[in-house]
Amino acid sequence: MKAKKRFGQNFLTDKKLLEDLTSLINVSSQDKFLEIGPGKGDLTENLINFCDCYFGIEVDRDLLTVLKNRFPKNKKAFINRDILKLNPSEIYPLNKFRVIGNIPYNISSPILDWCEKHYEKI
C-alpha cells in the first residue's frame, strides 16, 4: 500500500530502526500505549506483544482494515478517528498511558498541542 499524501503518511520499514526505537522506549508489561497513526503496523508489532494494553488511532480507513487483519483483537484495539478529536478518557478512563507514533509532519504541531492539553493522562 502506498502512502497517501493527503494524510501526510510516511511508513517506517527499516527493521533495524524499528528494533532500535522499541529498545529506546523500553516497553514493559505494565505499559498502556496510544499509538498515533499506526499505519501498516510495523512499529505496532513491536509494542502489542509486550505491553498490557494498546490502542492505535488511525484516520485512514484503508489502513484500519490492514491493521485489523494483521493483529488479533484481544486487548488490542484500532480506532478510526482523528487524534485531534479524541478525548483520551474514552479509551483510558482511569489510567495514564504512553503516546507513540510516526506522526505526519503536516500535523505535528497540533498533535503536540493535543498532548499538552491532555498531559495529566500521558
Please give the residue ranges for each predicted region.
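Catalytic cores of RNA-modifying enzymes
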Residues: 1-122
